[in-house]
From Swiss-Prot:
HAMAP family, per the entry: UPF0391
InterPro entries, alphabetized: DUF1328 (IPR009760)
Family to which the UniProt record says this protein belongs: Belongs to the UPF0391 family.
Keyword line: Cell membrane, Membrane, Transmembrane, Transmembrane helix
Topology versus the membrane: Multi-pass membrane protein
Superkingdom of the organism of origin: Bacteria
Name of the featured protein: UPF0391 membrane protein ACIAD3602
Subcellular location(s) per record: Cell membrane
Organism the protein comes from: Acinetobacter baylyi (strain ATCC 33305 / BD413 / ADP1)
Length: 52
């Protein structure tokens, strides 16, 4: 998931440099959502690993 978040962040950067504001904003939003989900899943995985 971190890889996909980085890919969407790069797409947002390239789109913003080329002047595509809508695509850049949408890609940034996807990158942020994926990053938050990945961090939450990583934290849950670290916490639950000791309990299994």
């Amino acid at each position: 998931m971190f890889r996909w978040a980085i890919i969407f962040a790069v797409i947002a950067l390239i789109a913003s440099l080329l002047g595509f504001g809508g695509v850049a904003g949408l890609s940034k939003d996807f990158a942020v959502i994926l990053l938050v989900v990945a961090v939450i899943l990583a934290i849950v995985g670290f916490i639950s690993r000791g309990r299994v």
